[in-house]
């Protein structure tokens, strides 16, 4: 029995050696050839996955969230930004009582190094913080003229998760505070290459334009045929307030001299309307005083009647006869109509007999 086992083992070893020799010589057995052909056919039918020739190195993660008290338009804008930025993360609303320094701890827990924070005040004013957590810098903006994707309904469209191009106004390179904001916007809004949630396509462009001391944001689709631009949305305008050295605080690097707070703006509007009302009341009071004043009687000017010619005096006629009464044409027509009607009735009754 032992001898037979040894022989079998030896036979198996010999067969394995033969297979190895055939593989080296390029001659596979018939079964191996069939397996390779089946694998080749399966590979032909298989749909190739997305092409990724590189490694994800830029690990930028953006935390996008807000404070309590925002309205529906701000919430929709926040959702649109999350949709356009696949490298973003969401979090629950922050309480108003918490200080802004707590956001740095939230970013650390969420493993994010950039933050977009929407701060609502008085249920009508919206502020946006762009911050590099935890070391800074950070910038505070007043958000104006918000138009969301659902509100605009533009004809443009882009692939969800695709990477955008960033287009900046040449004015960003002229002043140092705009150059700092440009770098901050590049790091926040640019989707990292080879990000797992991103698509390997570039089919839309974010434009940042400086006009009237404000930054105007637009999102356009790039059409493949003629490279034309069609707007997608959303839209908003950023009015810079301050740039801080730290994240959500610290020494002030720049303060916008052209900025006017919403409270001040509303106060100016109220003062203008109040001034108009006061002016109307003053005009009414002056008119009342003029009416109450006694009228000054001017002395008669004899030269005023120089060119007045007196009318000829007509003789007085006394009418002794009573004037004839005026003929009432309407009553006369009615009488004639009644007479004609009676005649017709008589004629019709005579014919019937």
Curated annotation (Swiss-Prot):
Pfam families: Brix. Residues 1-46 are annotated as: Disordered. InterPro entries: Brix, BRX1. GO terms for cellular component: chromosome; nucleolus. The gene is BRIX1. This is Ribosome biogenesis protein BRX1 homolog. PROSITE patterns: BRIX. There is a cross-link at residues 160, 314, 322 (Glycyl lysine isopeptide (Lys-Gly) (interchain with G-Cter in SUMO2)). The modification Phosphoserine is found at residue 261. Residues 60-249 form the Brix domain. The modification N6-acetyllysine is found at residue 276.
């Amino acid at each position: 029995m032992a001898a037979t086992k040894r022989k079998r083992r030896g036979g198996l070893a010999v067969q394995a050696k033969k297979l190895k020799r055939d593989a080296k010589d390029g001659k596979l057995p018939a079964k191996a050839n069939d397996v390779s052909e089946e694998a080749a056919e399966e590979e032909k039918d298989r749909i190739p996955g997305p092409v990724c020739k590189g490694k994800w190195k830029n690990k930028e993660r953006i935390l996008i969230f807000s404070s309590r008290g925002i309205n529906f338009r701000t919430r929709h804008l926040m959702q649109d930004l999350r949709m356009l930025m696949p490298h973003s993360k969401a979090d629950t609303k922050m309480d108003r009582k918490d200080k802004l320094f707590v956001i740095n701890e939230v970013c650390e827990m969420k493993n994010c190094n950039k933050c977009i924070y929407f701060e609502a005040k008085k249920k009508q004013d919206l502020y946006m913080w762009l911050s590099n957590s935890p070391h800074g810098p950070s910038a505070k903006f007043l958000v104006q003229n918000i138009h969301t994707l659902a509100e605009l309904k533009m004809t443009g469209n882009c692939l969800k998760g695709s990477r955008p191009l960033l287009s900046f106004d040449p004015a960003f390179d002229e002043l140092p505070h705009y150059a700092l904001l440009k770098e901050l916007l590049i790091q926040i809004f640019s989707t990292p290459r080879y990000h797992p949630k991103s698509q390997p396509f570039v089919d839309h462009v974010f434009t940042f334009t400086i006009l009237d001391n404000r930054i105007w944001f637009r999102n356009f689709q790039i059409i493949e045929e003629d490279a034309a631009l069609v707007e997608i949305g959303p839209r908003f305008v950023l009015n810079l307030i301050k740039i801080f050295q730290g994240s959500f605080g610290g020494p002030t690097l720049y303060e916008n001299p052209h900025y006017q707070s919403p409270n001040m703006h509303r106060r100016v509007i109220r003062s203008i309307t109040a001034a108009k009302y006061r002016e109307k009341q003053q005009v009414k009071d002056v008119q009342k005083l003029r009416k109450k004043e006694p009228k000054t009687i001017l002395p008669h000017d004899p030269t005023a009647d120089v060119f007045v010619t007196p009318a000829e005096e007509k003789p007085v006629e006394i009418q002794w006869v009573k004037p004839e009464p005026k003929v009432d044409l309407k009553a006369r027509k009615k009488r004639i109509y009644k007479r004609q009607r009676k005649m017709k009735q008589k004629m019709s009754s005579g014919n019937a007999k």
